[in-house]
Amino acid sequence: MSDTFLEIAYERARQAQQRQMKRRRAAAHRAARGPAPARAPRASPTQRTGTAHEDQALRLLAGAGLVPLARNLHCRAGEIDLVMRDGATLVLVEVRARANPRYGGAAASVGRAKRARLLRCAALLLPDLARRHWGGRIPPVRFDVVAFEAGRADWLPAAFTL
């Protein structure tokens, strides 16, 4: 082996060691600073509007005596906006808003397909909700809709059933 070949090999090994040492120092520095603060994902204007309507619906229902249990429960079938308790009844709430009533309004937007998705989602989430809040017994279930149109909230209790 020639001296040039050995010099090149030595130089590459030295550079690799320096890179590794630099990585270790950076990792130690990051560890000393602690974990990065968790950032909430930025919401689109539509998502912010939806969250505001859900907040209003939650205040409306809590003011009527319902007890909030969960919010925005996701499952593979979809999402349930609000989960409330009304005495011994589990109340699953869909919040809908429409700025323009031209196409039937907010309440009418909970059509057959949306109701079917909510029913599938409820069937998937019900065992866990019953275990957590009703000691494992399946409670009576009611589906309510809170519809926002023209700045007004309409609460439709028992909009449809299981």
Curated annotation (Swiss-Prot):
Lineage: superkingdom: Bacteria
MF-aspect GO terms: nucleic acid binding
Basic residues: compositionally biased ranges: 20-32
Disulphide bridges, residue numbers: none
Region annotation (Disordered) ranges: 15-52
Pfam family, one: UPF0102
Compositional bias per record (Low complexity), positions renumbered to this chain: 33-48
Family classification: Belongs to the UPF0102 family.
Full protein name: UPF0102 protein Bpet0439
Protein's organism: Bordetella petrii (strain ATCC BAA-461 / DSM 12804 / CCUG 43448)
Organismal lineage: Bacteria, Pseudomonadati, Pseudomonadota, Betaproteobacteria, Burkholderiales
